[in-house]
């Protein structure tokens, strides 16, 4: 009986050791688009941000004011996103969370985009929003969408294309939480047709089955200003 118990104990210790080694060897999630290994010690960037001396930390490092203020939505999208991430609240560093306020004019939208480093959870506090996300190619690019009213919540899985659009004739407001201190944002149209330098027109024309002249026009619309 004692021999059986001893074997069980040894097995548990081995499994615990293996689990601990897996945890300690796991790479941290990226906190920016890329982190290239640096050979020059005087030009070192870390995955995230360096830590401030704890003795010099104050309450101001953990706070942000003004998220109650409505933002200007007089732009071609009719929306404004106010992000509160580690760049606004230094105390968020290493904590893995951030948030944003989304303001929408009548018919305004937050166009199809992705957050490469975070899942998003959104709650509507004013108006009605049509929201949705598209699953991956493996899942046949299914669209999951819903109209949200005040108090409704919706989740957008990490890395999937999603959008929000105001479907009422009044302003709409929502707040979003992210599972990263720096979730990142890639607006699909801006990235594809406004990259710098531009993706070759022939590539986009074939990929989207468009005329090269239309691709050239879209490069002008979404590309950097010409003046």
Swiss-Prot record:
Phosphoprotein listed as a keyword: no
PROSITE patterns noted in UniProt: GERMIN
Binding sites annotated in the UniProt record for Mn(2+): 113, 115, 120, 162
Disulfide bridge map: 35-51
Signal peptide as annotated in the record: 1-25
GO annotation, cellular component aspect: apoplast
Location within or outside the cell: Secreted, Extracellular space, Apoplast
InterPro entries xref list: Cupin_1, Germin, Germin_Mn-BS, RmlC-like_jellyroll, RmlC_Cupin_sf
Keywords: Apoplast, Disulfide bond, Glycoprotein, Manganese, Metal-binding, Secreted, Signal
SMART domains associated with the record: Cupin_1
MF terms (GO), sorted A to Z: manganese ion binding
Glycosylation sites: 72, 80
Residue stretches making up the Cupin type-1 domain: 65-216
Function: May play a role in plant defense. Probably has no oxalate oxidase activity even if the active site is conserved.
Family of the protein in this entry: Belongs to the germin family.
Subunit structure: Oligomer (believed to be a pentamer but probably hexamer).
UniProt protein name: Germin-like protein subfamily 1 member 6
